[in-house]
């Protein structure tokens, strides 16, 4: 039939590397067979820039939105398509910054795969960014529960990392959690004061802080141990342990040094989630803000520009809608 002919044509044009024709053929195909999940998945892939070996071109706002629309079709027709779930989650969070939509997206995935840990990891990562720590704790408990399917090393590491992130962040904010939608929140004054200070990168921090300390420990242990035959391997081991310990301890220090930047990151997340603004103009014109925006995906930068243009304020009473709580 025409459907299978079109699908063959689409496959051939994709093999030739002709993404536009592939997209055109698949669009024609889904207008004839709206339930063709493979064709929708191909549309979702073709709407995005071609995967590159070197520097990857990132999708624009329009490309991202079109791809997400197609992916919503895919997961509706073929909920077992893991790749579609993962891609949709990445686009919603990293390229659109739509945290509420992403929470719902992963909640739907949980409906189809209740024993899978990935959706929980993703939901926890979103809730941490938005500052909802109590909800994180419940999900983490669920994530490590015996009902969940067994996971491989990579996922086990991600689970450990995400729960560490939660405990670090909630410790840092134990005095008060920053809610950017409250214009009178005391953290805004601190961001205003530090708005010329860009965040310190981990690499620079390790070089300025950890390296000199390690050098000091190394020299000191050489003096104490002397230069017998086994001195060098011993000093090396002391150094290694010292560097690892200092790096771990100093990451908390780095986090508190960069707290104003983490706060402003959250304010940007609030803006992209609500489509409304909460960042004062004096801060939006600052070196801190532009250094954070440089690290964002192009689609997010486009969205923020549109949100700033429409200039609607986030209501002070706004609260993140969390699907898990409305079950």
Place the predicted regions along the sequence by residue:
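Transmembrane alpha-helical hairpins and terminal membrane-anchor modules
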Residues: 196-270
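Structural signature of tandem alpha-helical TPR/SEL1-like repeats
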Residues: 16-24, 51-70, 96-105, 132-138
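Short coil turns that delineate tetratricopeptide repeat
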Residues: 34, 79, 113-114, 148-150
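Canonical positions in the second alpha-helix
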Residues: 28-29, 73-74, 108-109, 142-143
